[in-house]
A protein has these predicted regions:
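Conserved alpha/beta-hydrolase "acid-adjacent" motif
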Residues: 182-188
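Conserved HGGG/HGGXW glycine-rich cap/lid loop of the alpha/beta-hydrolase fold
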Residues: 1-43, 48, 62
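Catalytic histidine-centered segment of alpha/beta-hydrolase-like enzymes
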Residues: 207-220
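Gly/Ala-rich beta-loop-alpha elbow adjacent to hydrolase catalytic centers
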Residues: 61, 65, 69
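Catalytic histidine neighborhood in serine/cysteine hydrolases
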Residues: 193-209
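Short beta-strand/loop motif that positions the catalytic acidic residue
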Residues: 169, 175-177, 181
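Flexible "cap/lid" loop of the alpha/beta hydrolase fold
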Residues: 74-75, 79-115
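Conserved alpha/beta-hydrolase catalytic His-Asp/Glu region
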Residues: 94-97, 112-167
């Protein structure tokens, strides 16, 4: 049986480096590839993903990527074999004004300053890999076109509240959070798992918003266990 495709969508300002270790850890089970959608709203991002995706696939994402992945699962339930969400709660933006300001900074020439500001809180101070993860985030962010980041940030700022829609996601789902996530509280992941009929919640200690960089082995272990459960049932 051919290995299923697994689409991975990075967090805001991130690229394939976010998933380098994860892709290596899952290569014997799936065909992973990173996709950065083009769009300034979640529906446009979803349309871009579905246009490029195979007929059937697994999908996952971190933060911005997790929001897009969840929207894809809602938009095309017949095509999605499994969903992985990392650090992306189901609510609307808690501070839309802050989101608007972030896009203004990006479009106003403060790309570097914004990325460095985000880096200050994106990892856990308790993470052994936190300092390295922070520097990787900065390198990714500075290498990403600021307009691309701004468009994705626009999509996040106006995203809808999805708490009432989660029960419609029936595919096997992994909800993985860092306990020290300061962008998306881990309690949101636990609450999502209670609302989704086929979801498991995994919380990682001493990890912030970027588990794939801060705790690559623990993240890979959780992901492989989830994937093997899916593949056994195929």
């Amino acid at each position: 049986m051919a290995k299923p495709f697994f689409i991975l969508i990075p967090a805001l300002g991130c690229d394939e480096r976010l998933y380098a270790s994860l892709m290596a850890a899952m290569a014997d089970l799936v065909e992973p590839f990173v996709l950065v959608p083009d769009g300034d709203t979640l529906p446009r991002c979803v349309a871009d993903v579905l246009e490029q995706a195979p007929q059937k696939f697994l999908i996952g994402g971190t933060s911005f990527g997790g929001h897009v992945a969840r929207e894809v699962a809602l938009a095309a339930p017949d095509r999605v074999l499994g969903l992985m969400v990392i650090g992306a709660g189901a609510g609307a933006a808690s501070n839309p004004a802050g989101g608007v300001k972030r896009s203004e900074r990006l479009r106003g020439g403060d790309h570097q300053g914004l990325i460095r500001d985000m880096a200050e809180t994106i990892t856990s101070p308790a993470s052994p890999e936190g300092a390295t993860a922070k520097q990787t985030f900065i390198r990714m962010g500075l290498a990403t076109n600021p307009e691309t980041i701004a468009r994705h940030n626009d999509a996040l700022t106006i995203r809808p509240d999805r708490w009432g829609d989660l029960e419609a996601i029936t595919c096997p789902s992994l909800l993985l959070w860092g306990k020290d996530d300061r962008y998306s509280p881990s309690l949101d992941g636990l609450r999502m798992s209670a609302a989704m009929p086929n979801a498991r919640f995994v919380e990682l200690e001493d990890v912030g918003h970027l588990p794939t960089l801060e705790a690559p082995e623990d993240t890979a272990d959780a992901m492989r266990h989830w994937l093997m459960d899916i593949l056994i049932r195929r």
